[in-house]
């Protein structure tokens, strides 16, 4: 078989596919920007008075557009991989592109048959139904693309692992390639999860940053397996050990990325994030997930070879600590997976409705989270002078993240009450004074905005401006929280319903350390990118 010729032909096909998908996505985006309500998808998710930024976010604000975006970004990863290795003669590279092409073909088939975003109506709708008000937030412009960008990078890494099985060997060189593509995918997925958490904190009005919602968990699951994969690959690429760990984690990450789509888009789970309106798509989505998952596991069972010589660990070695890390991540992964899928399976079997909430997840994951922190501290001391700067930065991010969780949980104080202009209340040593109510009309909504002055020991330190918005197109009312923060504290206000003449319900929160959670996530990303940059320099 002439692998160089096959590589050239595959590259041409992959690049052409990406160009055509980019054209299709560009056409859909143009339809949103000009408010072409002859397209059903545009009429359902846009509005003529939306700003161009929100019209852009509306492109992937529904089921059909978000799937097209995912396919486009996966195709972009494939095109980047093809271009980067276009001169390579090793069969690993055309085999990787073949695996990616098969997955893209399956996803495109689903888009064409069940999720076509270009279906038209005649005569056109006079006006659009508007974008879901909960999604009209800056975080939603970047949150879904980053998640799909992360899934795409991780699917490339999994495709490298599957291609190595087809080739017959998963060695250190394959692990290095797999690691190189998993790292940016993991970074993008982490950034997407951080943005989603920030959106939930700013938009949902309950003062929390993580709700253990099924769709939040759907992105967390591949993140957990991908984090374990990066740790496993760090040993496989250097010493060619933990090869089976790396292969299986790559396959599991692929499966969980697809499972996330099944949870979000099938309508099986009810969530503020789930956009599918019926279960018609559930069967083909589940079939797609089952086909790719079973084929990947079957390939592993058929082609995976013995891992080689037995590796013996001595005491608290780096290898032993990484093995402990892998086991802990797998334990947390299993806990989250069971808590997410059990209510779904319970309902599908006709046994009724069941909800698994935050108390289960918090109690079940806490011991393993504490053990992870112990492992990180031990790894720092065991490594001594050999500790690498990227690992130090990433692990510092984990510690800052953990500190943010603890401090925000312990320091949180809240109060619910009714206030009228001129009244005030003191919470956690800070005084909130409801000064006045402003009425505004902006674009696609009207709003009642409360002006709440914030005082610290009689000194005015700022204002909070929570709103009640009414979206005319959807006939829907939304509460818009207002947040003021510094490096340590957050002051959070939500205005609720009118309870009397000039009296309104308010929920007020004061807590510390919330920003450390997202800062810790950014440090983890910085450590990963620094590791990738150093690895690239070493390879050169």
What is each of the regions a protein language model found here?
Residues 1-540:
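Solvent-exposed, non-transmembrane regions of integral membrane proteins
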